[in-house]
UniProtKB/Swiss-Prot annotation:
This is Apolipoprotein N-acyltransferase. Belongs to the CN hydrolase family. Apolipoprotein N-acyltransferase subfamily. The chain crosses the membrane at residues 8-28, 34-54, 74-94, 105-125, 128-148, 178-198, 206-226, 501-521. The lineage of its organism: Bacteria, Pseudomonadati, Pseudomonadota, Alphaproteobacteria, Hyphomicrobiales. The gene is lnt. GO terms for molecular function: N-acyltransferase activity. It comes from Sinorhizobium fredii (strain NBRC 101917 / NGR234). Keywords: Acyltransferase, Cell inner membrane, Cell membrane, Membrane, Transferase, Transmembrane, Transmembrane helix. The active site is at residues 287, 351, 405. Gene3D superfamilies: Carbon-nitrogen hydrolase. It holds the Pfam family LNT_N. Pathway: Protein modification; lipoprotein biosynthesis (N-acyl transfer).
Length: 531
């Protein structure tokens, strides 16, 4: 281990950047669909040793002293995000004649931009760097700050946060009932990076002992929580049917296929109950599953009424149109409708957190003012964002907290009012991304919201992964990717959580300050010995 550490420490220039890239790429294998937990225990020690090799001189300017560290962080981040987000390019091939030109911007450009956050992480860490366990704490602080900023800056994109690598299965997800993802990010980096101490010796006993204790607590708490009785269904029980139609995205966008698509959803809705099961009370369709403006098609509402049996409720993703006033084009919302057995819309909720460049064009007014209206007109999007999230109340009193598409990756989208609901509802359409890691990563991140909130999740996805997940993050029923069909299950009940979002936020700041003090004291000790 010492020999390997020495070789990595002595790297410089392009060799150092390339190894940083490989370390980031390796770290990505700890995320879904691979979930190779051990990969992070190799990649982060490599990162520590690369930073160890950054030599600075007092007579150099601040930029020259910090730039090598930032470049290491950027190389690591570029490998990590390129390996984890390449599948975004699939979306640009659905209408390749219009958008294939933009594919490199997503596949290479987005990882290059996101890598700047990890450049910042290493930059912060390098300012506090020392030669013992303090540098492990410094790296944890740096990544904690970077991942926290990534969760909200520029509308936020916390996809594949480092902490998810420490939670590959429900057993290792239970810490999220106590800590938020931001805290888990920091502690995960500390644990992943601690083996670097073996390669350099100093502080190894203390650092590895702390890392082992954190890891043991993480696993032990998971065993404890999963050993508790599973949450019991609320009374009266409600059976939920998930419809997974597997409609190709190109077909969804073909106007000639609209009627066929609608009838496919209805046929799956009307399928008989599964063997030994009861008739579903609630049927859930995926995001934008209704292929037209439903309020403009009374015949479609009548068809829904024909298919639904007495007392059944349909919850379906749809595009909702709203009159914007005389002479103005209508506003469109990515929405969820609740429809009763008479074909009446009895509830609706609109998406709050839209996808930049996918559902709306940032700075569209600026582009138009610069005379670039043709670019704005040819970009995807056109949705308006809701000003607030409306909880869906179903006939009979059940309440669902809606999360449309990638809203489910944002822990902060689920506020305190969610606990008043009976379940989280996530509808999505991942057909854009094909059979790639993307849909698996999306499901994994959505799954964690159940443990944070103590609520079960109902998840309907066009091409998968559709599932009902209980409040412990355990899969009750599910449909794999590209499996066309339905699955029914009784909706599980709630489960208490150890902390609320406010307390978790305080724990994050306390943990960050504590690690910062450890790093600062170690740094001060290094300076004292040097002088």
């Amino acid at each position: 281990m010492e020999r390997l550490a020495g070789k990595i420490i002595l790297l410089s220039g392009a060799s150092r950047a390339f190894v940083g890239f490989l370390a980031g790429l390796l770290a990505m294998f700890a995320q879904p669909p691979f979930g190779i937990f051990a990969a992070a225990f190799i990649s982060f020690p490599m990162l520590v040793w690369l930073i160890d090799g950054v030599a600075t001189h007092p007579d150099e300017g601040v930029v020259r002293r910090l730039l090598p560290a930032a470049s290491i962080g950027w190389s690591f981040g570029f490998g990590y995000f390129l390996g984890g987000l390449w599948w975004l390019g699939n979306a640009f091939l659905v209408e390749a004649d219009l958008f294939a030109w933009a594919m490199p911007l997503a596949v290479v450009g987005l990882p290059a931009v996101l890598a700047l956050f990890y450049a910042l992480a290493v930059l912060v860490a390098r300012c506090l760097w020392s030669d013992g366990v303090g540098r492990i704490a410094a790296l944890a602080v740096g990544f904690g700050v970077a991942e926290w900023l990534r969760s909200f800056l520029f509308t936020g994109f916390p996809w594949n946060a480092i902490g998810y690598a420490a939670m590959p299965m429900p057993l290792m997800m239970q810490s999220a009932s106590v800590l938020n993802v931001a805290t888990i990010n920091m502690l995960a980096v500390f644990v992943f990076a601690a083996p670097a101490l073996i390669g350099t010796g100093k502080g190894a006993r203390v650092g590895l002992a702390v890392a082992a204790a954190l890891f043991a607590a993480h696993i032990g708490y998971g065993y404890y929580r999963l050993s508790l009785p599973p949450p019991q269904p609320l009374t009266p029980e409600r059976t939920v049917r998930l419809v997974q139609p597997v409609i190709d995205q190109a077909k969804k966008m073909d106007d000639r296929e609209r009627a066929v698509i609608f009838e496919e959803h209805l046929a799956l809705t009307a399928a008989p109950p599964q063997a030994g099961g009861k008739r579903p009370d609630i049927v859930v369709w995926p995001e934008t599953s209704i292929p037209f403006i439903l309020t403009d098609n009374p015949d479609a509402l009548a068809r829904i009424a024909d298919v639904l049996q007495d007392g059944q409720i349909l919850v379906a993703g749809a595009v909702r149109a709203e009159d914007a006033g005389t002479g103005l084009p209508p506003r469109y919302y990515n929405s969820i409708y609740v429809i009763d057995d008479r074909g009446q819309i009895v509830g609706a909720s609109d998406k709050v957190h839209l996808v930049p460049f996918g559902e709306y064009l940032p700075f569209e007014d600026v582009l138009n003012s610069w005379g670039l209206s043709s670019i704005a007109a040819n970009m995807p999007g056109g949705f308006s964002a809701a000003s607030n999230r409306s909880v869906l109340t179903l006939p009979g009193g059940r309440t669902f907290y809606p999360l449309i598409c990638y809203e489910a990756i944002f822990a902060d989208e689920v506020d305190g009012s969610a606990r008043l609901s009976d379940a989280l509802l996530n509808v999505t359409n991942d057909a854009w991304f094909g059979d790639t890691p993307g849909p698996r990563q999306h499901f994994h991140q959505a799954q964690l919201r159940t443990i944070e909130t103590g609520l079960p999740m109902i998840r309907a996805a066009n091409t998968g992964i559709s599932a009902i997940v209980d409040a412990r993050g355990v899969l009750v029923v599910g449909l794999g990717y590209n499996y066309k069909g339905v699955t029914d299950a009784i909706l599980p009940g709630k489960m208490p959580t150890m902390t609320d979002s406010m307390l978790r936020g305080r724990i994050f700041w306390f943990t960050g300050v504590f690690l910062l003090l450890v790093a600062a004291i170690s740094r001060r000790g290094l300076n004292f010995r040097t002088n």
